[in-house]
Amino acid sequence: MSAHLEADVIVVGSGVAGSLIAWRLAEAKLKVLILDAGPRIDRTEALKLFLAARDKNINAPFPPLPSARATDYYINAGVDIFRGTYMRGVGGSTWHWAGSVLRFRPSDFRMRSRFGVGLDWPISYQQLEPFYDEAEQALGVAGSNTETWGAPRKSHYPMPPIPPTYLDSVVAGVLGPLGMSLGIFPQARNSIFYDERPQCCGSASCVPLCPIGAKYDASVHATKAEQAGARLETDAVVYRLETDDSRRISAVFFRRPDGSAGSAKARIVVLAANAVETPKLLLMSRHDRMPKGVANSSDTVGRYLMSQIDQVTRG
């Protein structure tokens, strides 16, 4: 069965970027269509899967996609150069993110002039600050208005900081004599009731799943977008973009796991399918007039991917 859909704006992906954009546009009374490659995620069912899982890894609460069963074995023919844990599903990978929302510091935008490496950004911290404020209000961020981690503020966080745990106090007591201190990062997690979501109850399972929805995930704004009039199509894997004579994307084509297919047209198409899927889609949509892929005259689409580098310790 084929579907032919039309909208003012198509948003590909319902993660944090796509859902926020869809919400704002739907509130502005535009006809918005959201296409997500994954299913809706039921929090109660996800919690059951997590509790029953022997290996409580980052994707344990979430059902595997039909084409990627967890029981299949993985054939490694060489070095595994990139292994992402991003999700397909309404809300995207914010379902299993930690929720830490540190701002960049002013010096991060002036790497060349300040430190002599890299490049300076074409925008400054001061230009972005109002948008940081807006994002923190939308997501619901709990943080200290005095402990800013080098990023000055003109406005207050919408919620007070998450209180330190007993373990935090023990670690702080050990670090103190060593000349080190312990601080609390700003968190997209409710320290009080906020935006119709409950206060954090301290389950200590932000990764991979908040059992009560106190930690922000983008399904919050996907739902708000729908309430404002947006249409959300799940299990719709976009595989090709069509461009018009002015080289603008005018239509998208998608398939579903059951074999059905469809297309959608709009005046504006927003690609918000994360740093891997978005360039992949642009490159997959190459044609005679755009042999390097859509929006790739620079030949840099899909290059220079930088993942998150961190050290996580659990105990």
Please report, for each region that a protein language model flagged, where it lies by residue:
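A short, glycine/Asx- and small/polar-enriched loop/turn
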Residues: D195-R197, D244-S250
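N-terminal FAD cofactor-binding segment of flavoenzymes
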Residues: L30, A37-G99, Y125-E134, D168-G176
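Conserved redox-cofactor binding core of oxidoreductases
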Residues: I58-P61, D72-Y74, R112-V238
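Periplasmic solute-binding protein
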Residues: W95-G116
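N-terminal Rossmann-like FAD-binding beta1-loop-alpha1 element of flavoenzymes
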Residues: A7-I34
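Glycine-rich loop(s) and the adjacent beta-strand/alpha-helix scaffold that form part
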Residues: E27, K31-I34, G38-L51, Q227, ...
